[in-house]
Amino acid sequence: MPALSPAKKGTDKGKTGKKTGKQEQNAQDYIPPPPPMPGDEAFAMPIREIVKPDNQLWLSEADLNEEVAKMLTANNPAAPKNIVRFNMKDKVFKLEPMVEQTVVHYATDGWLLHKSSDEAKRQMDMEKMEQEASARFQADIDRASHEHKDHGDVEPPDDSRQLRNQFNFSERAAQTLNYPLRDRETFTEPPPTATVSGACTQWEIYDEYIKDLERQRIDEAMKSKGGKKAAAAARAAGAAHRQRNEHVPTLQSPTLMHSLGTLDRMVNQNMYEEVAMDFKYWDDASDAFRPGEGSLLPLWRFVSDKSKRRQVTSVCWNPLYDDMFAVGYGSYEFLKQASGLINIYSLKNPSHPEYTFHTESGVMCVHFHPEFANLLAVGCYDGSVLVYDVRLKKDEPIYQASVRTGKLNDPVWQIYWQPDDAQKSLQFVSISSDGAVNLWTLTKSELIPECLMKLRVVRAGETREEEDPNASGAAGGCCMDFCKMPGQESIYLVGTEEGAIHRCSKAYSSQYLSTYVSHHLAVYAVHWNNIHPSMFLSASCRLDHQAVGLCHDPKRAVMNFDLNDSIGDVSWAALQPTVFAAVTDDGRVHVFDLAQNKLLPLCSQKVVKKAKLTKLVFNPKHPIVLVGDDKGCVTSLKLSPNLRITSKPEKGQKFEDLEVAKLDGVVEIARKSDADLAKNAAH
């Protein structure tokens, strides 16, 4: 070991700083060795000298004993933090928030295998088989050596002589005579050939059937009394029919259009397969964890190029096909009137309407006939009423009210088909702003109107006996609805511009049965409950923000629901008698269930943006609802399980009686709460 430099005296005195307690303790513990004897310098003990830099930091005892926490993180400091990738959905570059933080310092492929792995088991089995084979081979060698020792010395066989296989070896060769090859040919004339081709298609089969039917018709004409003249007439009619079909262009033939429609529907079904599965099988699983709340699932959106920038004024389901509905387009604004449009859509083809009809004025209401599903009654803004036959696929109506046949002067707001038990003819009822409730009868050539009721203003405090039709002024009609209870089909409700709702009958055209005054402004929607004979909804849409449930016995509102926005429409659910919904101008759909919550909606969901909802209608067989807006779009929504809870009647109990009892209970509770509030106000 090299000798250390000699100690320096006064080294610590000139340095800045202060010695710590530990350093002083070490300095006190150190005892320098004794000086060496003369002549023993080579064997002297080394002297330890503590060499310190001039800029060394002096720390106190507390600083030295302080614990410094070290934190290990899993973040890679070398990982990039500004990676961006192109988002194909939004068509923009977006920052990638998640970056791989793994750092590989060393990696090698190991050769060790776990004993329980499949590959290790296979290797151990192979080694075991090799060991067993080696053991058997060694045992055979040992056994042979023992046998050789037992038998003594045996001379080995002489392998010098070559052995021949007597089965494969022939010592002598023999050659035989090979006969030469001979060819024998014959030449004949080939039989004549002909190319025959043909095609069998549906239209060729159809043409053959038509020809066969024509031959049968000619044969029957020959056998009849007319003889040759009748046969000639039948032959001429068949020739004219063929000539007419031949002049139809191929691209305009009905068969081609039908085939293209089928192909278009198949393509749409493949495109919207997921939506169709949601329509059939979707149920919101979260409803099980949030009782008293529900949701609406958007399904299809129905809009066409011609319906854009038009307001949806009416929606009606077809009574025969539960997947088909008609939509009427018009305008509620007086200064923005234009031509009308009617689109008939199907849930199987949401891309295009099945049928389209145009009207000169805006369409305000549509209604399918409940028995003859091909007849569609239409009311327009200019006061005209039309009847279309959807099967004809023609843009012209089969019936239209003209000025000569009693065309109305004001907009027709509501229209309903009505049965005629006496004459067995087709009839429908309309209501317009001029206060006329007309009954229209379809004859062979025209529409015949009949005035059922002339609405008039009822003064406050006036009784039914004091009513004077000549003294009171005319009231403007806005909406109507017929009672759906058996035996009461002739009773209907009428909403007026004065805020009154009149209960009328087709049998009494001079007086109101009763009058309800629950709104301060015009009533634009009124709907009777499907099973309760005295419960109905009314709404003063777009004006006083209230949807009101009424019971006709006390002639006053039983329950009021303030939705804090202008209401577009209100309607009862077809499958749940205690459920109703309303749409507002802010694009929300409010769904109420009086059996679960009598004050607040179970669902208040925004379904459209930058649009006002104008119409609402429930499907009569499926738990879906259609809502229309002022942009010409119709959206279909599916109700979650909490929004379509129905009562399960016990054995011997009817579903209708149970639901009526529930509604009566709701009315009774509302009456008691009103009575308690009146008592508290009196005190």
Curated annotation (Swiss-Prot):
Keywords: Cell projection, Cilium, Cytoplasm, Cytoskeleton, Dynein, Flagellum, Microtubule, Motor protein, Repeat, WD repeat. It is found in: Cytoplasm, Cytoskeleton, Flagellum axoneme. Coiled coil: none annotated. GO terms for cellular component: cytoplasm; dynein complex; microtubule; motile cilium. Gene3D superfamilies: YVTN repeat-like/Quinoprotein amine dehydrogenase (2.130.10.10). It comes from the Eukaryota. The keyword Cell inner membrane does not apply. InterPro entries: Dynein_IC, WD40/YVTN_repeat-like_dom_sf, WD40_repeat_dom_sf, WD40_rpt. WD repeats lie at residues 358-398, 407-450, 562-602, 608-647. Residues 1-42 are annotated as: Disordered. Pfam families: WD40 (PF00400). Belongs to the dynein intermediate chain family. Is essential for arm assembly or attachment to the outer doublet microtubule. Consists of at least 3 heavy chains (alpha, beta and gamma), 2 intermediate chains and 8 light chains. PANTHER family: DYNEIN AXONEMAL INTERMEDIATE CHAIN 1, DYNEIN INTERMEDIATE CHAIN. This is Dynein, 78 kDa intermediate chain, flagellar outer arm.
